[in-house]
Curated annotation (Swiss-Prot):
NCBIfam families: PRK15416.1
Enzyme's top EC category: hydrolase
GO molecular function: phosphatase activity
Family the UniProt entry places it in: Belongs to the phosphoglycerate mutase family. Ais subfamily.
Function: Catalyzes the dephosphorylation of heptose(II) of the outer membrane lipopolysaccharide core.
Protein name: Lipopolysaccharide core heptose(II)-phosphate phosphatase
GO BP annotation list: lipopolysaccharide metabolic process
One GO cellular component term noted in the UniProt record for this chain: periplasmic space
Superkingdom field: Bacteria
Species annotation: Escherichia coli O7:K1 (strain IAI39 / ExPEC)
Name of encoding gene: ais
Length: 200
């Protein structure tokens, strides 16, 4: 009887170890983390986060006209026609899961155009403070969030702002491409970085 109990306990122990290994392997293949060390947050995960607390999503603007051979939309300091298409596609996918949000951009042509094409008619508020990319960006985010504490916020800003936030909040090296984004939230007066937004 004692031998049977020992054998049974060993079997259970091995089973638990196998389950743990399977879980670890599953996490490894799920690509839950970006190569830069930031958690990856897709549309569905973002929607679940938004049910827990309002989210703040910061996007880099779409493709710049002055750094591309693609056709410009209009002003050379703005975005390309391809950039408008990419912004509209991103906006459609985003709005399908997060339909209710306030929209902001810094006061440059490229961020304003990106936000406009992303939103498909939603009211846009331009705020020059969103061009400041040191600690000032946190004050700007908290100020916007305090105006409507229960609303999600989308901000169109610049790559150096996103790079600064990732390094400052999580010591991560983040070099955002056009329309890459970060997900944040404000809690008890503090701004937290949740991860990198991945559109799929």
């Amino acid at each position: 009887m004692l031998a049977f109990c020992r054998s049974s306990l060993k079997s259970k122990k091995y089973f638990i170890i196998l389950l743990a290994l399977a879980a670890i392997a599953g996490l490894g293949t799920h690509a839950a983390w970006s190569s830069n060390g930031l958690p990856r947050i897709d549309n569905k995960t973002l929607a679940r986060l938004a049910q827990q607390h309002p989210v703040v999503v910061l996007f880099r603007h779409a493709e710049r006209c002055d750094r591309s051979t693609n056709q410009c939309l209009s002003d050379k300091t703005g975005i390309t026609v391809k950039g408008t298409q990419d912004a509209r596609e991103l906006g459609n996918a985003f709005s399908a899961d997060i339909p209710d949000f306030d929209l902001y951009s810094s006061n440059t042509v490229r961020t304003i155009q990106s936000a406009t094409w992303f939103s498909a008619g939603k009211k846009l508020t331009v705020d020059k403070r969103l061009l400041q990319c040191g600690n000032e960006i946190y004050s700007a985010i908290k100020n916007l969030q305090s105006k409507a504490p229960d609303k999600n916020i989308v901000i169109f800003t610049h790559n150096h702002c996103l790079t600064y936030i990732a390094k400052d909040k999580r010591d991560a090296t983040f070099k955002p491409d056009y329309l890459d984004g970060l997900v944040m939230h404000v809690e008890k007066g503090k701004v937290y970085l949740d991860g990198e937004f991945v559109n799929h």
